[in-house]
Regions:
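Positively charged, small/polar-rich N-terminal and surface patches that mediate targeting and assembly
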Residues: 1-119
Length: 119
């Protein structure tokens, strides 16, 4: 495992859960890309509410299945690795969504405990 402690870059991608690429959720395609490019790791977060360029508020209600909720995909890695993957991310994103970077100070990067599997 390579260490990425210290000053790194946070890549944050915000998009609608309804976005697709080749009939698959776009966030899934982005996750597959980041894994294939061997970035340190990625996390996908689903928002409970948000609004975008259309100014309409999208929210999750138990009584109604909502579409277009915000998805946030976050990756922390070196500047070089983030810079290398950005053109590919941009190509997948097409129109819509937000892609941003910011500096991040990584205090700890360690593998999770082994998962407990049921027998």
């Amino acid at each position: 495992m390579r260490g990425i402690e210290g000053e790194q870059v946070l890549l944050r991608i915000i998009l609608s859960e309804s976005r697709t690429h080749d009939r698959a959720p776009l966030f899934r395609r982005l996750l597959e890309l980041l894994r294939a490019e061997e970035l340190a790791g990625a996390t996908v977060l689903k928002g409970v509410a948000g609004f975008g360029h259309d100014r309409g508020i999208h929210t999750f209600m138990l009584e109604v299945t909502s579409e277009g909720l915000p998805i946030v995909l976050e990756v922390v890695d070196t500047q070089e690795r983030i810079d290398r993957v950005l053109p590919k991310v941009d190509a997948l994103m097409g129109d819509g969504g937000v892609v941003m970077t910011e500096r991040a100070h990584v205090i700890r990067y360690a593998p999770s405990r082994p998962s407990i599997t049921e027998s």
